[in-house]
Every structure is written in structure tokens, then in C-alpha cells.
A protein has these predicted regions:
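Glycine- (often His-adjacent) and acidic-residue-rich active-site loop
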Residues: 364-393
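An anion-binding loop in the catalytic cleft
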Residues: 2-32, 42, 202-316
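C-terminal long alpha-helix characteristic of the crotonase
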Residues: 169, 449, 488-555
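Conserved CoA-thioester-binding segment of acyl-CoA-metabolizing enzymes
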Residues: 289-363
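Crotonase-fold acyl-CoA enzyme core
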Residues: 403-406, 412-419, 427-438, 442-517
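A short beta-strand-loop structural module common to alpha/beta enzyme folds
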Residues: 48-61
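Donor/substrate-binding cores of folate-linked one-carbon enzymes
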Residues: 79-192
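Hydrophobic/aromatic residues within transmembrane alpha-helices
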Residues: 362, 373, 424-425, 482, ...
Length: 578
């Protein structure tokens, strides 16, 4: 079987390309079809360009794909491998480097966060023999506030800057008069420098260090590779850290696990404590890439650790009331929701729907939701049974949203969403999406038919034909397409805080409408009519019948797809009929 993966799309015609940029052929060369690459693919197609994606798992496949397409421009949004010389010497090739002009090396964001940089950038660099040393096609800078997680910075400010530069590079490639600027460290705007790869020793900390220093180290490595340390004598990599309480007069020894709550553990530091949400067991060669809730990894080592009181620890689920609006925030690590997390969310939803509010606003975190937790499933003693329990639990969550009788429900999708996470959002009465968000409303790449009432909520919004096309094509959907097809009711531009404030205003306008009682009555009437036509339980049962075959019979290679995803290995998905 071939070890490369690519797909090709002919350019779209709506909306047309801007008049000042002629449509061109663009090859996106990447290490993985990650969020940034997906957004580039979506936006370039929307702009009228012909776009092909090639994942760089095999240099020979890269050379063959580029030669076959003969692109006007090769863009590398996310690339760890070297571009083959046969490519960059024959076709203009631009690499998006996550650092300011002059910055070079494979660990730019790690160094920026560990060094406490308050401003950073992205540079579009032409590929040459020496890595990151080519002529500059453009650059952007942005502020770095607080102690962000590396993955959040990458998926936020870095992605926004990179997308601007991709559009700029395409415009310049279409301009025969354009000449890139040679890298010149004498120029004042060239502020970066060559930095080596971050070593394990560079990331190290001692638990007796101040909490802020430890948080900075962990967050600079969040996503990948994490920071190696020990907890309870177990060698682990730590992820998803949050500030805890001051130690005060407590005699806790730094490095001691002093609390636990909802999968996270509280660890004493030199001047307080931090909460660690996820760990990777470095002593287990069977699960080298498996990040799991911290208490799952530590197991019996934390059996005697006291459960922290409510309000302490990472707040994955929060509810607050703003007048006639109830706001329920779900913020799960990487958007993955385990069985236990789904059960807690179901409880929170039940509480929220019982309040005397007019509108229930569902708000996500940096990632809105990606559905079930593949890591927890993989680590289970019986992965199939855990997958089934997870699916049943998330179905119960989705039913709470769809069948909510006393409020209008608004989904506030400020971050990317995939699979069941998209369907969860679509269960609401109104869906508002931040401009630039990418949705993946499909399951087949994971070898699953899908559940979460997708056969009801997706066709309800886009129609049967478009719904079938979305779940079988398995392609990302951008905000323009989401609005055109009916996946979204409104698209809001701007930074995350601007977006969230706008959605609250949207919800308030719904609550304050003079005809609100009629709106709620219409919602109940439509739901009752749909129920008479086909009960929700019927949709659910039909989906679960298909999922049972996928999960327990592994009919479409769910096991292989899941393991490939967790370990970041290539996988060619099976075809799943919709």
C-alpha cells in the first residue's frame, strides 16, 4: 500500500477570486493535514484557485505529485520535512515559518514561550538549500499575552497570521514583477536569529521552582512533546497545566500530588501548586503517544489523594447566568470528550435547561469539540466497550440539546470542530460560527458511520443531498460554505473575545424579542412535527446499529484508524457507505 495521501479539488467558482488576483494552481505540501493546512485549502478554493494537498510522508510521492500538477506555487503551511531539491529548484516554494523575519530553526514557538517573548510573528520564506534562510515573501507580527499554551498560540494568532501571508503569497506569485527580499540581518525588521532544536534538558524544571516558571515550561511544550518529569515515582510527560492555589502554611513537599478532580491532579510547587490535566506514561512502550487524564495514568498512585472541592481545578464545564441567558461553557482538552466528561456535561445541561432563562448559550473552548475521546478508548482494557459507552454518553448529551423544550439554544462555535462535535453544535436552534473556523462534519476517516443524531441534525440544516455529500467526501468546511449551505446561521469576524461578546449580544437579542413566546412555540411545534414524522429514538437506534458493527466488528478498520490518529501515523481509511 502506498504511504502517501493526497486529494485534489478543482477550484470552486463561488465566491469568485478577487479581480486583482488571477486564479492559479497551488500545491499545499504539509507534514499533516492539520487545522492550518485545512483552512488554507478551504480559503484558497473559496478564492477561486485550484488547490491540491500532498502530505510529505514520502519524498518520491511528493516529487511525483508536484510534477503531475505543475503548480504555479507550492506552499508549505506546516512542514517538518525538507522540501526535495527537485521541487524548490523547479517551482516557487514558500514555507510558513512560525517566527519573525530572521528566526530560524525547528523550535521557534517553544523558544518564544520559554523566553517569555511578548511579541512574535510568522514569516513566509522561500525554500532554499539552507533551512529557513531563503528570501522573504512577507511577514506578520502579533502580541503574545500571558502564558499561552503552544497549541493555542499556534491554532490562534499563528494561524491567523499564516493565512494572511498565504493569501499575500498567492497574490505575489500571480504578479510577474514580484521579487522576494533576500534575508538580510542588517535590516532593522529582521529581528530573529538561528536557534537550535529544544532539547529535553532545555525544557526541564524542578517542582520546587515557582509555579509561573513551571507553567511556562509546560505550556511551551503543550501539544507536543510535553515536558518530562516524575510524579509519584513514575516518569511522565506533562500537559495541560493550570495555576493552583498558594501553599500558604501547608507543608506539602514540591512534586507531591496533593489533590485530584475530574481526571486532573494538583501538584505542589515551590510557591503554591499547579493542576496537571493530562499525562503520558514514559515507561509504557505500548502507548508512546497516548495522552490521558492524569488520574488515569497515575492510577493507584493517587488512590489516597483527596478529591478537591468544587470550584478548584481545571474548569472543563462552567455555567453562569447573564439575565435571561444561561451560558454553559465546555472546554475539554483538544475538544475530546470521554464517557465521564459526557456524563458530567449531560448533568450540567439538565441543570441549565431547568433554569428560568429564555436562551441557553453553548460555548466551546479553543477547540469547540471533536466528539469522543479516542485516547481514553484506546487505553481502556476493552476499547470496544469503552467506545460504545462513549458514543451512548455523547448521544445523551446531544439529545438534551435537541430536545430542550424551555429555551432557545444557541451554539457559539469559536474554535474548530469535528465529527460528533459538529453534530453537537448543530443540535442547537441557532448556530453562530467565528470567521475562519474549520468544521469537519464527517466520521468515515475514523472508520465510523457516526452517531450523535447526525442523520437528523445535519439534513435538517443542509438537506439530504448535501448532508450525504459532506459525510462521504470527508472534506473540511469553511465558514463561507457553512453559511451558504445552512450549517451556520451567522458568521462573526474578529478575535475570540470579540466573537464571544457578539454571540452574547445575539443571544440577548433573541431573549429580548417581543415575539419570543411565538419563537419558542414555533420551535416546540417543529420538534413535535419532526417527532411524529420520525422519532428521535429511531434516528439514534439506526445510527447505533451501524456503529455497533463498526465498533465491535471493526467493519471499517476503526481500530487501525484510531491507533494511527493517536500515534500520528499515516492511515488510508476504508470506504464507509452513508
Amino acid at each position: 500500500m502506498s504511504t502517501h495521501y493526497s486529494f485534489r479539488s478543482e477550484r470552486t467558482t463561488s465566491p469568485p477570486a478577487p479581480v486583482h488576483v488571477r486564479p492559479i494552481r497551488v500545491m499545499l505540501l504539509c507534514s499533516a493535514f492539520n487545522g492550518l493546512t485545512q483552512r488554507a485549502w478551504v480559503e484558497l478554493r473559496e478564492a477561486g484557485h485550484e488547490v491540491q494537498v500532498q502530505v510529505a510522508w514520502d519524498a518520491g510521492a511528493v516529487r511525483a505529485a508536484v510534477t503531475a500538477m505543475a503548480p504555479d506555487l507550492v506552499i508549505c503551511p506546516f512542514l517538518r520535512e525538507r522540501v526535495p531539491a527537485e521541487v524548490w529548484t523547479a517551482w516557487p516554494t514558500v514555507i510558513l515559518h512560525p517566527g519573525p523575519p530572521g528566526d530560524r530553526g525547528p523550535s521557534s514557538l517553544d523558544w518564544a514561550l520559554m523566553n517569555g517573548e511578548t511579541a512574535w510573528g510568522v514569516t513566509a520564506v522561500q525554500a532554499v538549500e539552507e533551512m529557513d534562510a531563503g528570501p522573504i515573501w512577507g511577514s506578520r507580527t502579533f502580541p503574545v499575552r500571558g502564558l499561552p499554551r503552544k497549541s493555542d498560540l499556534y491554532n490562534g494568532a499563528v494561524t491567523e497570521a499564516a493565512i494572511e501571508l498565504i493569501h499575500e503569497a498567492v497574490a505575489k506569485a500571480a504578479d510577474p514583477a514580484f521579487v522576494a527580499e533576500p534575508l538580510d540581518y542588517a535590516r532593522p525588521e529582521v529581528t530573529g536569529r538561528l536557534r537550535p532544536a529544544v532539547r529535553r534538558a532545555d525544557r526541564s524544571f524542578d517542582w520546587s521552582d515557582p509555579s509561573r516558571h513551571i507553567l511556562q515550561r509546560i505550556r511551551a511544550a503543550d501539544g507536543s512533546p510535553g515536558v518530562s518529569t516524575e510524579l509519584g515515582g513514575m516518569p511522565v510527560a506533562v500537559f495541560y497545566a493550570h495555576e493552583g492555589r498558594d501553599r500558604g502554611e501547608r507543608p506539602d513537599r514540591p512534586g507531591m500530588v496533593v489533590g485530584r478532580r475530574h481526571g486532573a491532579v494538583q501538584v505542589a510547587t515551590g510557591d503554591g501548586s499547579i493542576w496537571v490535566g493530562h499525562l503520558r506514561n514514559l515507561s509504557d512502550p505500548l502507548v508512546p503517544g497516548l495522552k490521558l487524564p492524569a488520574t488515569s495514568v497515575l492510577g493507584r498512585l493517587v488512590d489516597d489523594v483527596p478529591e478537591a472541592s468544587r470550584g478548584l481545578g481545571p474548569r472543563e464545564i462552567e455555567y453562569h447566568r447573564d439575565g435571561a441567558i444561561g451560558v454553559l461553557t465546555l472546554d475539554f482538552y483538544n475538544g475530546a470528550m470521554s464517557t465521564q466528561q459526557c456524563r458530567r456535561l449531560e448533568t450540567a445541561l439538565r441543570y441549565a435547561t431547568e433554569q428560568d432563562t429564555r436562551v441557553l448559550l453553548l460555548r466551546g473552548g479553543p477547540t469547540f469539540s471533536n466528539g469522543i475521546h479516542l485516547g481514553v478508548i484506546e487505553a481502556a482494557a476493552d476499547p470496544a466497550s469503552e467506545a460504545w459507552a462513549n458514543i451512548v454518553a455523547i448521544d445523551d448529551v446531544c439529545r438534551q440539546i435537541i430536545a430542550c423544550p424551555e429555551q432557545l439554544v444557541v451554539s457559539s462555535v469559536g474554535g474548530n470542530a469535528g465529527a460528533g462535535g459538529v453534530m453537537l453544535a448543530l443540535g442547537a436552534d441557532h448556530v453562530v460560527i467565528r470567521e475562519g473556523v474549520v468544521l469537519n462534519p464527517h466520521y468515515q476517516t475514523m472508520g465510523l458511520y457516526g452517531s450523535e443524531y447526525w442523520t437528523y441534525v445535519l439534513p435538517r440544516r443542509v438537506g439530504q443531498v448535501v448532508a450525504r455529500a459532506m459525510v462521504t467526501a470527508c472534506q473540511p468546511v469553511g465558514t463561507s460554505q457553512a453559511l451558504r449551505t445552512g450549517l451556520a446561521d451567522q458568521i462573526v469576524p474578529g478575535a475570540r473575545a470579540t466573537f464571544e461578546a457578539a454571540v452574547v449580544r445575539y443571544a440577548r437579542q433573541l431573549a429580548d424579542r417581543p415575539d419570543y413566546p411565538n419563537q419558542l412555540a414555533d420551535k416546540r411545534s417543529r420538534r413535535a412535527a419532526d417527532e411524529r414524522l420520525r422519532p428521535l429514538q429511531d434516528y439514534r437506534q439506526a445510527e447505533l446499529d451501524r456503529m455497533r458493527t463498526d465498533i465491535f466488528g471493526n467493519a471499517n478498520n476503526f481500530t487501525a484508524a484510531r491507533r494511527a490518529f493517536i500515534n500520528k501515523r499515516p492511515h488510508r481509511p476504508a470506504a464507509v457507505s452513508a
